[in-house]
C-alpha cells in the first residue's frame, strides 16, 4: 500500500500502470491458506477501487496460474503435511505432470501489461 501511495503522483502524470500479482487462492478456498487468500482478494479489490479513484492510472490484478516457484516447492516439500490431502496431491501432481509454468511465462505477460495494458482492463482480475 505504501509503495502504491508513493508511486501514485508519478503514475498519474505518466498515465502509468500498476500490475498486482494475485492468485487463485483469492477466489478458491484452500485449507490453512486463509491469510494468503484474503491478502490476494484484497489486491483484487484494491485494483478495482483504484480503477475508480485513479482514472489516469491503469490498475490490473492478474492470476498467473501455477508457476514453478519457491512457494510451489515449499507446498510440496515442507507444508504438504499441514495441507488438506487433496490440495497437497494436486500441487504435487502439477509438478510431476509438468503442469507448472516457468516463471518467465507469466513474467512476460505481466511485463507486457505494465508497458501496454489498455485502459479498458483497469480494475480487472485477469486469469
What does each model-found stretch correspond to?
Residues 28-34:
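Active-site loop immediately N-terminal to the catalytic Tyr-X3-Lys motif
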Residues 4, 39:
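Active-site helix of classical SDR
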Residues 19, 59-62, 72:
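Hydrophobic structural elements of the Rossmann-like NAD(P)H-binding subdomain
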Residues 1, 36:
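Catalytic tyrosine of NAD(P)H-dependent dehydrogenase/reductases that use a Tyr as the general acid/base
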Residues 28, 49-58:
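Active-site-adjacent segment of SDR/Rossmann-fold oxidoreductases
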